[in-house]
Design a protein with these regions (language model features):
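Hinge/lid segment of periplasmic solute-binding proteins
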Residues: 47-62, 127-181, 209-212, 316-323, ...
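Short, well-ordered beta-strand elements
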Residues: 64-77, 94-99, 122-123
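Helix-loop-helix "hinge/cap" segment bordering the ligand-binding cleft or interdomain interface
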Residues: 89, 97, 149-153, 164-234, ...
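Short helices/loops that flank or line small-molecule/ion binding pockets
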Residues: 107-119, 137, 189, 210-218, ...
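Mature extracytoplasmic/periplasmic domains
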Residues: 64, 305, 329, 334-422, ...
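Short, low-complexity disordered leader/linker segments with a strong preference
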Residues: 1-69, 452-464
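Extracytoplasmic "Venus flytrap"/periplasmic binding protein-like
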Residues: 86-156, 169, 191-193, 288, ...
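Extracytoplasmic/periplasmic substrate-binding proteins
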Residues: 57-59, 73, 81-88, 234, ...
């Protein structure tokens, strides 16, 4: 009887020990899960996933169940009508209230909203023409801080300066990269330069001196009917972009030092008679794509659609793309940012992350709209997308995406934009038609006029 009670006590103790062990194991498991939940989410990881059983799925560390409403101002209605429905498939509880705003009116509308305290968008775009002015307003959030935790290291190497303000804060991501080379008419290149192959043309035109000499030959062979670059401002855009470097320090603008070298090459082209008489983005310039009186044009990833297809719709197979002599440059471009005083920062970031950074969003944004993001991982993970090409490749008989990324991106540099960059560009635009026509004005005289025009628009600045 005593032995039976003893055996029963041992069984009871054994059962209790097993129960305690199970409870402790469960606590350890729950504690581990709690540690995972409180860790900082990575806002740059790709793919929709659930972190643990029973948890809501995330995209880039952002819960896809996130709720809220954001205001977006954009000038590309086709982008909005395509991407917003795709975004809502992943983030169904977010309402995107968008307004189509002309890019020429964007900055004025934004400044009016900020000044009056009326509606300001949560997601703000910054076209290159006014990006420095926008960044200097100090109304954009630093994307390397909470709640975004995006790192500059993820960007293509030339982009951080172009997406940072003068304090060094990363305040935007790229809507679509804009490394640029030279697009050219294959028929004219073959007739006047002897080849339409981009590699052979690069060998034939290794620098701008060779380009000018060949341009003189083209002028003579065509009786002056065919030029190398369609406009004075097109040539300036290339030459200035290739020599990108900081030249604005606070309110001091080192204009002479910055522009001397590109101006020397630009005016040499003018004096050699190899530039067309058009002004960029005028009706005549647009018509020249199909007319066939000019060989080369600055060409960024957006140009085949908006310049070639739009102006030469019958030009399938007529075009080529090559790196410019002496290197690549940026041509246009738009930053995408979060308003510093937004009440829906996490939701705004979800929109930006999906549309411009995630593989899920880029499957539509790149494949349907042709936009290439500015992050290294896209090109590392989706080389097959680039190799598949786009419908615009038929105009060039070559893979445009690979040409831009492989041949041009490695040579591109960028610099931080300020409000004075916009002023410098405005001053140039007011003067270059005169410089095109009046060949008595040389480099030194033009630089003096340039400095005076900038000073008139920025009297508080020191112009050197």
């Amino acid at each position: 009887m005593k032995n039976r009670r003893l055996r029963k006590s041992w069984v009871t103790l054994l059962v209790l020990a097993m129960m305690i062990t199970a409870i402790l194991a469960g606590c350890a498991k729950n504690d581990s899960a709690a540690n995972r939940n409180t860790s900082e989410p990575s806002s740059n990881s790709g793919g929709t996933s659930a972190n643990a059983e029973g948890e809501a799925p995330t995209l880039g560390g952002i819960p896809t169940s996130i709720e809220g409403e954001i205001v977006v101002w954009d000038w590309d209605e086709a982008f909005l009508t395509t991407m917003v429905p795709e975004f809502n498939k992943v983030f169904p509880n977010v309402k995107v209230k968008y307004t189509v705003v002309n890019n020429n009116d964007y900055m004025q509308k934004l400044q009016s909203g900020i000044a009056s305290g009326s509606e300001v968008p949560d997601v703000i775009l910054g076209e290159m023409n006014f990006r420095g002015q926008l960044f200097d307003l100090d109304v954009l959030d630093n994307l390397e801080q909470a709640p975004y935790h995006f790192s500059k290291d993820q960007l293509l190497d030339y982009l951080p300066p172009l997406l940072s303000n003068t304090k060094g804060e990363l305040v935007g991501v790229d809507q679509s990269i804009t490394p640029a080379g030279l697009g050219y008419r294959r028929d004219l290149a073959k007739e006047y330069l002897g080849t339409d192959d981009p590699n052979e043309l690069s060998t034939l035109l290794p620098d701008w001196n060779a380009f000018i000499q060949k341009g003189i030959e083209v002028k003579e062979k065509s009786g002056g009917a065919v030029t190398m670059i369609a406009s004075f401002d097109d040539a300036y855009r290339v030459l200035k972009g290739q020599t990108e470097q900081p030249y604005i320090n606070g309110s001091t603008i080192e204009l002479t030092e910055r522009m001397k070298v590109p101006f020397e090459k630009l005016f040499a082209m003018r004096d050699a008679g190899i530039l067309g008489k058009y002004e960029g983005y005028t009706p005549g310039w647009n018509a020249s794509f199909a007319k066939g009186d000019n060989i080369f044009y600055p060409m960024a990833p957006w140009s085949p659609k908006w310049n070639v297809q739009a102006n030469d719709p019958d030009g399938i197979g007529r075009w080529g793309l090559m790196a410019a002599p002496e290197g690549g440059f940026t041509y246009g471009g738009t930053s995408v940012s979060v308003y510093k005083n937004s009440k829906n920062k996490e939701v705004a970031w979800a929109y930006i992350y999906f549309c411009y950074l995630s593989s899920e969003g880029m499957e539509t944004n790149y494949k349907k709209l042709g936009n290439m993001p500015g992050i290294k991982s896209f090109f590392e993970e989706h080389r097959d997308w680039l190799e598949a090409g786009t419908e615009l490749d038929q105009f060039f008989n070559q893979n445009l995406s690979l040409t831009f990324y492989d041949d041009i991106v490695p040579e591109v540099t960028g610099s931080t934009q300020t409000k004075y960059d916009s002023i410098v560009q405005t001053a140039f635009n007011s003067l270059f038609p005169l410089w095109m026509k009046d060949t008595s004005i040389g480099v030194d005289g033009a630089l003096e006029q340039f400095k005076e025009a900038v000073k008139n628009q920025a009297p508080e600045a020191t112009i050197k």
